[in-house]
């Protein structure tokens, strides 16, 4: 993939396919590193599948025999000298705390570092397609933070205003852009 935001969108879509009602996306960025954590409360993966999930020929899909999302994300991290770690628990393993946590570390100074890309569009697209899912996003960089919490948005807006309405999506986009501009982030 040409930018990491597309990997993040792919992993979030995996979370949705696993029945997640809550998705947490956290980015911590320094001058030299980018850490990305994506967590959910979906069905999780059993130990056997978890061991093979970064193999491109391991997929839960029935429509095709390959799954490239996690393998490409892992490769993107490792080619910078970083890593990818996945922890997952099924409801049978942990009835009250099931789900999956994907954590990566990228070294930004490496010549093979894939740019983060457009997180604003990624989040807007994710929210547009899944307004009922709680999404908590935070990106810490340059001593500040850009964040989005759809649970808080729902509390403020009430039940009659859908989060994927054009007005709300426009506000989300402008709010995120304003936050990134304030931190000096360049897309």
Region locations from a protein language model:
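Flexible, glycine-/charge-rich segments associated with ATP-binding catalytic modules
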Residues: 2, 78-187
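Conserved alpha-helix in the HATPase_c
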Residues: 2-10
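Conserved beta-strand-loop-beta-strand hairpin that lines the nucleotide-binding pocket
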Residues: 6-7, 16-67, 72, 79-111, ...
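Aromatic/hydrophobic pocket-lining residues that form π-stacking "cages" and hydrophobic walls in ligand
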Residues: 11, 73, 123
């Amino acid at each position: 993939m040409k930018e990491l935001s597309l990997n993040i969108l792919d992993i979030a879509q995996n979370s949705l396919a696993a029945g997640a009602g809550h998705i947490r996306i956290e980015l911590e960025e320094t001058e030299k590193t980018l850490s990305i954590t994506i967590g959910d409360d979906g069905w999780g993966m059993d130990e056997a599948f978890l061991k093979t999930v970064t193999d491109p020929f391991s997929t839960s899909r029935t429509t095709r025999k390959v799954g490239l999302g996690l393998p490409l994300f892992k490769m993107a991290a490792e080619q910078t000298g970083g890593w990818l770690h996945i922890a997952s628990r099924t409801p049978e393993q942990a009835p009250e705390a099931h789900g999956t946590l994907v954590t990566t570390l990228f070294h930004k100074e490496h010549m093979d570092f894939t740019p983060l890309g457009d997180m604003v569009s990624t989040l807007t697209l994710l929210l547009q397609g899944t307004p009922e899912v709680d999404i908590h996003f935070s990106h810490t960089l340059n001593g500040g933070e850009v964040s989005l919490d759809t649970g808080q948005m729902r509390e403020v807006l009430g039940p009659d205003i859908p989060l994927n309405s054009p007005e709300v999506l426009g506000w989300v986009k402008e709010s995120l852009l304003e936050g990134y501009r304030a931190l000096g982030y360049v897309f």
